[in-house]
Structures are given as C-alpha cells and as structure tokens.
Amino acid sequence: MSRRRHSDDSDDSDGQPHKRRRTSEPSEIEERLESLICRVGEKSNSSLESNLEGLAGVLEADLPNYKSKILRILCTVARLLPEKLTVYTTLVGLLNARNYNFGGEFVEAMIRQLKECLKVNMYNEAVHLVRFLSDLVNCHVIAAPSMVAMFENFVSVTQEEDVPQVRCDWYIFAFLSSLPWVGKELYEKKDAEMDRLLSQTESYLKRRQKIHVPMLQVWTADKPHPQEEYLDCLWSQIQKLKKDRWQERHILRPYLAFDSILCEALQHNLPPFTPPPHTEDSVYPMPRVIFRMFDYTDDPEGPVMPGSHSVERFVIEENLHCIIKSHWKERKTCAAQLLSYPGNNKIPLNYHIVEVIFAELFQLPSPPHIEVMYTTLLIELCKLQPGSLPQVLAQATEMLYMRLDTMNTTCVDRFINWFSHHLSNFQFRWSWEDWSDCLTQDLEKPKPKFVREVLEKCMRLSYHQRIIDIVPASFSVLSPANPVCIYKYGDESNRSLPGYTVALCLTIAIKNKASNDEIFSILKDVPNPNQDDDDDEGFTFNPLKIEVFVQTLLHLAAKSFSHSFSALAKFHEVFKTLAESDEGKLHVLRVVYEVWKNHPQMIAVLVDKMIRTQIVDCAAVANWIFSSELAHDFTRFYIWEILHSTIRKMNKHVLKIHKELEDTKARLARQHKRRDSDDDDRSSDREDGPLEEQIERLQEKVESAQSEQKNLFLVIFQRFIMLLTEHLVRCETGGIDVFTPWYKSCIERLQQIFLQHHQIIQQYMVTFENLLFTAELDHHILAVFQQFCALQA
C-alpha cells in the first residue's frame, strides 16, 4: 500500500512529492517495524539469536519516535502469537536491558491489556498474556516475588463464595499452565510460597464437582486411553514436572543465549493485580476433557511420544493448538506452520498433529473452528507429507472405527462428515474389506451404522452408481438406496386408491401450467376421510387432499432441487391453505417423507425450504421427527441434521428480530441526543412517535418469537422424555438390558441438543427445570440435565 502511494506521489506535478513522501514516511516505518516483529522467529539464514539481537537494536533506535507503536505491536503479538511466546519474551528482555523505562512501560501495558481481556470475557487470550508475563521472569524483566504474588491472588479466587466453579477453574488453569515455563525459576526463588500455592490448588481440585465430565467425553470407555478432565490432567502433568525438579525439555528458550546480558538488567515489580469480581455478564470458558488417541506404542520406529502426564505433551499440544488458531483461515500456511514445528525431529510430529486436529474436531460442545476447516487442513497436510502423513491418518481412522462402540454420537456425526468428505478428495479409495466385520453385526450397532451413513454422505458428494461401484458387493446391505421418487399414483395397479383420478387431473393441470385457483378447483371434490360432511368449502385439514397434491407435485418436480423449489414457490398459496392447521403441516411432512424416503438429502432440503417459506413451522418439524412414522429412521443421521437445522433457523429468527429492536432503540437514542442540541422540541416529539410505536411492535414480536423458541425446546425435550421413559419402563418390566444401541443413540441425541444450543437453552433453564426435568424423572434422563447444568456452574 505504501509503495503505491510513493509511486503516485512521484507523478504529481505540483512540486510537492518530496514533502508528501516525508509525511508518509512514519507510516512506512511503522509497517516495517510491524513486519520485522511479526516475522522474527521464522525460518531464516541467520540464527534466531542474531535476528533477535539485530531486531532489539533496530527497535531501540526507533523507541524515541515510535515507542507507543512498538508497545502496541509487542502487546498484540503476546496475545495473538503464543506459539512464539519465548521469542518475544527474549526480545522484550533485550529491550529492557537496553532501556529500563521501556521495560516498565511494557509491563504496565500488558497488565492493562490483561485487565481489559478479563473485562470483555477474552479468557483464552488472557491465558496467553499471563504465560507471557510469567516467562518475563526468566528474561529478568519481572521480579519472581511479584509474579508469585500475582499467582497468590489467582489461587485466592477459589476461596470466593457464591461464584461459578468455572471462574475458579480459569484462574487455577492460568496459574498451572504457566508453570512449565516459569516453575523452575519461581521454585528457586520462592519455594515455600510455591508449595503453599500448590497445596491450595490441590485442595481446590479435590473438592470441585465433575458432574459435567461424561457429557464432554469423546468415548465412554477409558481404555486404551483415559479421557481425563482438563484440570485433572494438567495437575498430574505439573506434579510429574515438580517430581522431575522442574526440568522441561521441549520449550524453546532463546533467552538462555543472552543470560550474561539479561542477568545484568534491572527487574520490575508487577503492579498489584486483583482479579476482577464476578458479574452477571461474566462468561467463562467451559471445562474440557483431554482427547487422547495415540501413545508411544503407535509409532515404535520413530521418536518416542511423550507420556500423557508428561508436561512436554501439554506444551506440544498447546503450541499446535495455538498454530491452528493463528492460521486456521489459511489452510496452506497452517499446514506448513504445523509441519515446521520446532524440534520436530525429537517427537513423532505427524502423530501429534493428527491427534490435535481430531481433538479439536471432536471437542464438545463444539469445535473451535468450522468442521470443514479440519478436512481441508488434513488434505493439505497429506499433500505436503505424502510419504508419511496419509499413513498416520489411515491408522487414526482405523482406531476411530475400532472404538465406535463407545464413541459419543455427536463425535460419530463429525467423524462421518470428515471421513466422507476426505474420501471424496481421494477418489473414494478405501480398503473396505478391512471393515467387513460390520457386516455380521446387527445393523443398528455403531459400526454398520457408521459405514452406512458414510456411504450415504459419499453419495451426496458423488452419485449413486459411483458408490455402488466403489464398495464390494458384500456391502450391498449397507449401500444407499437408489434415490428415486416413490409416487404411489404412478402405477396403474393402484387405480383403486382414493384420489387416483384426482392425481391424474392434477398431473395434466400442472403440466399445462395451471394457476393456484385451478388447483384449488380440482382439489375441491376430494372427499375428506376425517368427516362425513365437508361443509366448510373443503379447505380444513384433509389428509387425502394433501396426499394427492403433495405426492403429484413432488413427483413432477423430482428432476432436481431447483425444480422442487420452483414447484414450492409456484404453488405456495395451495400449500399454505392445505397446511393451515397443525395437523395439516404434520401431514405435509409425512407425505414428503413417503415420496422421498430413499433420498434423505432431498427430504432435508425440502423441509428446510418449507420452513423458510413458512409452509410448515419449527414445532411441526419437531413433532414429525418424533412421530411413529419416522420411528424406523429415528437413529439416522439426516433426521438429526434436519432437527438441528430447524432449531438454528428458529434461533436466527429470534436474533434477527432482537437486532431490529436494538437498532430501533439506538435510533431513538440518537434522536434524543440531537433533541438536546435542537430548539424545536415539537418537531422532535413528532419524530419520536413513529419510532416509539415501532419499538413497541418489535418488543411484542421479540416476546412472541422467544415464546415460540421456548415452546420448540419444550416440545423436543418432552418428546425425548416420553420416548426414553417408555423404553426404560419396557426394559424394566421385561427384564431387558436398558443400554441398547437405540438407547445410547437417543440419550446422546438429547445431550447433543443441550450442547449444540447451550447458549439459548440457558435462557429458559428455570422453565425446563420446573416443567420437565423434575426430581420425579428417571435418573438416567435427569442425569443429562444435571450434567448440562454443571457445565457453567
């Protein structure tokens, strides 16, 4: 940008180019400084140490003119580039050794930034800042006693009363997760105080509740790898680090090369730091469960993978997560950065990368980034390391398949999405015969179900015959059905069916581009099987009318999605009239299913379109999904895809109206502000009137939409409770094992609803607790609600 300005200036003919170039020079220098700081630590012909020394010299020379800019850049990289933490702490250490006042200003700026992050709930960035400050102790910028004092304030949060556990968790995590970097230094200077802090931490960890853990575990079984709660795992890693005399072997520590310079520098005390009090607006990070997939036995020939309670494992995983967070929008850069991770010859890097990517993909309640990003990232990694990474990925896929029986249903969904998408990029090549064990199992068991859903998804990304061709003939029982329309009026043998003649008339009329009125006229004579006298012009709920019309229209529009959408749009008025009642809406959905039961994707897109065009509403879709007609497909992937899409639409609708209300209130506030500087109060009053009326109308719309939203969740939870209770009673009276594949799927789908829509559900918790999740409910079902409540407790 600056180069373009320079060239434009030189073309000026008014004799001012030099003057204008000089005024743009500061911005060019600022851009250069930013580039130098951001790029330090990347691959270079020179050593990191000489680059840091050179950069420190450049920055020191520019401090008189660009101090505030340099401070701002350094604070930003401390927050946003944690994978280069020790590079930047060393740089700050060198600057502090050269300019003590700058070091003090930097520490104060970091504390201000930390307070601001905590104030606006940016807790992940705040952890990076705390770690950065702690590593400045190693660089002789911050005095160890003042860092210990800050950690004492952190740990004291666990003594606060009436605060959520997740608040205490965050402060304990911020303290413990800094110790791999600074534990040795703090212990050498303040061993008694550190022992006391660790003792208080242990006491807190022993008394904290862990009801939430089952809801967040990827697997229900702890073999071969325990699925530990994140603070428990970190505590074990810190305990081992302490036992090893705080010797950590993986963190890059460039400041050691400058020890003779840094140890001469004067140190700063941190300003007193009191954790901001808990408020209603505080939103703390949710607890996590640590994902484990590999250990040292999985790569016997390469470097040894650190153990799960080794602090090196924590450091490697943290850094890889940070790299993904910094570069996730650019898959090529992200893949290259992951593969050039420092010390990659000392660790089985490919195994660590694959494990970390799957840890994020399977993270509950939701991955940190959109799911498709992980697919594209793994494809990019396979391209960059074609000789090794695809083999590790295949090994991981095999492990995931083998552990499907105990895998969380939400994670199975993500596994299906990832694997089918991945296969589509590699000509759908896979050694399907290796999974032939699934063919001897009950089709409702996790393995055959997984293979069936993967092939179904692959068909969406290809076409039916291709999928039939790629899998062995023995897998035909799991192969997707031919996605053709089932039109019951198309066969002459069905002439005796009620409505057959009307269907023929409709077919001719629609082909001849009939209007809505003409369609109404044809449908008028269809008898209503639900009543003897059709005395209301024939447009109340008439299942036969709906059946004949919807069957015929969808059959004629079956060629493509766009043909079907056009048909819905053209005959929207007919749909709205026929589906005016709740029963009508439900029956429209039933007929859609009858016609397209062999094409789940078509069902999903048609239902989506019908909600958007208000032919059916969200509550009707929820009731349809839990109806007996869909019992056969209840555990199928597409059913839950439809339900979650329906809930998201409702949530977006509420948010949209709420935003309109807030925008209108803001406009009124701006008008009032203008009135204060305006003499004509009467004209202002006239302007206020319409806005105030609009706000009133929007408030009513928001309340109505929120009521619909709450009702949708009530319907869903009520139907879950009914289905699960029936199953539990049936098993109890029949002496059958409760934990069937159907039960596992159903109870985990209930968990999925809570987790995927947790922010919305939190708003209505009191209602749900009072009306549905009462103490009388079976403990199997109530446990899910209690686990959910514990997530933010």
Swiss-Prot record:
Amino acid composition bias (Basic and acidic residues), ranges on this chain: 683-692
Localization: Nucleus; Cytoplasm
Coiled coil: 686-716
UniProt-recorded Gene Ontology molecular function terms: mRNA binding; RNA cap binding
Region ranges (Disordered): 1-30, 668-692
Record's keyword terms, sorted: Coiled coil, Cytoplasm, mRNA capping, mRNA processing, mRNA splicing, mRNA transport, Nonsense-mediated mRNA decay, Nucleus, RNA-mediated gene silencing, Translation regulation, Transport
Record flagged with keyword Cell wall biogenesis/degradation: no
Domain of life: Eukaryota
MIF4G domain sequence ranges: 30-242
Main location as per UniProt: nucleus
InterPro entries per the UniProt record, alphabetical: ARM-type_fold, CBP80, MIF4G-like_typ-1, MIF4G-like_typ-2, MIF4G-like_typ-3
GO CC, any one term: nucleus
UniProt-listed GO biological process terms: 7-methylguanosine mRNA capping; mRNA export from nucleus; nuclear-transcribed mRNA catabolic process, nonsense-mediated decay; regulation of mRNA processing; regulation of translational initiation; regulatory ncRNA-mediated gene silencing; RNA splicing
Subunit relationships: Component of the nuclear cap-binding complex (CBC), a heterodimer composed of NCBP1/CBP80 and NCBP2/CBP20 that interacts with m7GpppG-capped RNA. Component of an alternative nuclear cap-binding complex (CBC) composed of NCBP1/CBP80 and NCBP3.
PANTHER family linked: CAP BINDING PROTEIN, NUCLEAR CAP-BINDING PROTEIN SUBUNIT 1
Similarity-based family: Belongs to the NCBP1 family.
Function: Component of the cap-binding complex (CBC), which binds cotranscriptionally to the 5'-cap of pre-mRNAs and is involved in various processes such as pre-mRNA splicing, translation regulation, nonsense-mediated mRNA decay, RNA-mediated gene silencing (RNAi) by microRNAs (miRNAs) and mRNA export. The CBC complex is involved in mRNA export from the nucleus, leading to the recruitment of the mRNA export machinery to the 5'-end of mRNA and to mRNA export in a 5' to 3' direction through the nuclear pore.
Name the UniProt record assigns to this protein: Nuclear cap-binding protein subunit 1
Organism: Gallus gallus
Gene symbol of the encoding locus: NCBP1
